Amino acid sequence: MDTRAVSVVIPTYGRGQVLLDTVEALLSLSNPPGEIVLADQTVRHDEAAERVLRGWDDGGQVRWLRLSDPSIPRAMNQGLLAAAGPIVLFLDDDIRPDAELVEAHARAHLARPGELVAGRMLQPWHEGRADPEDKVPFGFNTLAPRSVTEFMGGNFSLPRDAALALGGFDENFVRVAYRFEAEFAFRWLQSGRRIRYEPGALIHHLKVPAGGTRTFGEHLTTMRPNHAVGAYYYALKTQRWRGLPSAVRRLGRAVATRHHLRRPWWIPLTLIAELHGFLWALMLLGRGPRYLGRGED
């Protein structure tokens, strides 16, 4: 499969130079994708970044979608709709792509049509080394391909038509959209499709501390339910009331951490965040999923 059949979609929020570096690296690949679509939720870039992005958009190197109201699944859905290629490759906005990233995704789809391809994510703490093949939990950083049941949202590709047939990503996953990938993977597998981990499709994730989902803060040091709501919504949506035991276990685990042992004053604040997240998840569950083309059903 030609790499020109691949549309790269990059949801981005609050990122400046690292976003420009990411796009520049993709444009410089010897076998680049057919297009790069930026689903940009940033309210305002600095003047220099704005000038570069506008130049790319005007010159046709990049399609620059300006979106309001930050939402990871909504940005991904808008990128999915805008993509022209039959294969859509979603990437984080703070990465360094391997030279054969797009080629590896294209080859995987040629070898296994119709599957979702989960790429390898080399994180800063890996220090350039792969994980052992038997590492638990699986961290998408081994050297052997395998069938998997989930994927990481910063490096995966799938057939556009198949994703649209499922309604895209559930926009009920708010704020940091925690577990939105797991919920989509659940629906993908339930529909009879498969997920394949492909280690040759490699990115170096820079994990820049500013911007992106980290704008909403860290889950250990906030009383906001930005992480908890996604965890509870995922459990209840995929398991219904059978998900209640796992929800109760999460409530206990949320305060059974070294952070809370050393800073016990965070325990009541964390419990407030968790309970708020659980109630919010119940409300979202009652309202029904928000898929592409269906609104709130």
Over which residues does each language-model region extend?
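Short, acidic, metal-binding catalytic loop of nucleotide-sugar glycosyltransferases
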Residues: E24-P33
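A conserved acidic beta->alpha catalytic loop
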Residues: A25, D40-R51, I95
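Glycine-rich, basic loop-to-helix element that forms the pyrophosphate-binding segment
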Residues: L67-A83
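A recurrent flexible, glycine/aromatic-enriched loop bordering the glycosyltransferase active site
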Residues: P73, Q123-P124, N141-D161
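Short aromatic/hydrophobic "clamp" motif used to bind/position activated sugar donors
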Residues: V88
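Conserved donor NDP-sugar-binding/catalytic core segment of glycosyltransferases
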Residues: E100-D131
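A short, conserved alpha-helix in the catalytic core of glycosyltransferases
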Residues: F156-L158, A162-G167, V174-L202
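Non-catalytic, C-terminal membrane-associated alpha-helical segments of glycosyltransferases
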Residues: T221-N226, Q239-D297
